[in-house]
């Protein structure tokens, strides 16, 4: 394992460190100006740079990101209606707040949003805030404990169906039963002074956030993105996926290119 990590480090770090310079050379020093000028030829240049830098090997699936991104955007618009733009804005920041691309973020959010919105009696604005916090909590938990993010996402999706068997995936000191979730809610109530209802998904997600705040887990993803190689590379991978997806659908090339340069 250590040998493989060392090999990956030697192969990836020089590519990652040189990527920013290559992009700026192709685009000019001002990413905003670069984005304004981004046409087909420029977009092609950036895609070639990503491949040449070795990042393309890691994010090869991102070349098909466009169609998936369009589908995810449609799902968010259907669920969040007048507050869809709020959810999309959160998704654009996911590369650094949750360590995932906007598309991956929206796909996961969509999986539990119907139940979340229902628990808030149709308040899509509040649902967007709680969904965003839940996504950050999942990522922070994964980064803190080294748990597979898919296992944590499965747990959260289970909670949306009142299935608590995977609560222990979060490694917060609670077993995978309804009784243990009720214990978590009571502990969260002691910390926040707010009462949480196990039958209300918004309450469940909020209570988990309170417990993670108390354990010092909150903010781990953003901190690692700013201070560690693995965190910053994960952020760059997500930013690259965002850029390629937006090139494919004619979306926000300017903003996603700027994000990519910032993380490179």
Please identify what each model-predicted range represents.
Residues 29, 121-122:
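Short N-terminal signal/transit or membrane-insertion segments
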Residues 18-22, 85-87, 124-126:
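Short, conserved charged micro-motifs
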Residues 48-98, 110-118, 130-142, 151-197, ...:
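Small-residue helix-packing and pore-constriction motifs in hydrophobic alpha-helices
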Residues 1-67, 163, 249-252:
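Low-complexity, glycine/alanine-rich, low-charge segments that are largely flexible
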Residues 107:
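Tryptophan-paired
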């Amino acid at each position: 394992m250590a040998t493989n990590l060392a090999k990956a480090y030697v192969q990836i770090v020089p590519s990652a460190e040189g990527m920013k310079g290559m992009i700026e050379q192709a685009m000019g020093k001002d990413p905003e100006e670069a984005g304004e000028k981004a046409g087909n030829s420029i977009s092609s240049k950036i895609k070639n740079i990503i491949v040449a830098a070795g990042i393309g090997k890691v994010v090869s699936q991102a070349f098909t990101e466009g169609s998936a991104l369009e589908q995810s955007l449609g799902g968010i618009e259907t669920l969040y209606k007048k507050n869809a733009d709020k959810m999309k804005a959160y998704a654009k920041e996911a590369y650094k707040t949750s360590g995932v691309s906007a598309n991956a973020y929206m796909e996961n959010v969509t999986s539990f949003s119907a139940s979340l919105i229902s628990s808030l009696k149709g308040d899509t604005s509040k649902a967007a805030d709680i969904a965003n916090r839940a996504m950050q909590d999942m990522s922070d938990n994964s980064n803190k404990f080294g748990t597979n993010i898919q296992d944590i996402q499965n747990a959260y999706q289970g909670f949306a169906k009142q299935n608590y068997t995977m609560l222990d995936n979060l490694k917060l000191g609670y077993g995978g039963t309804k009784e243990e979730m009720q214990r978590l809610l009571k502990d969260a109530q002691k910390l926040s002074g707010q009462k949480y209802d196990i039958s209300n998904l918004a309450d469940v997600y909020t209570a988990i956030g309170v417990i993670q705040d108390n354990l010092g887990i909150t903010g781990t993803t953003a901190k690692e993105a700013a201070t560690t190689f693995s965190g910053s590379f994960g952020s760059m991978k997500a930013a690259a996926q965002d850029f390629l997806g937006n090139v494919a659908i004619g979306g926000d090339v300017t903003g996603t290119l700027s994000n990519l340069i910032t993380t490179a």
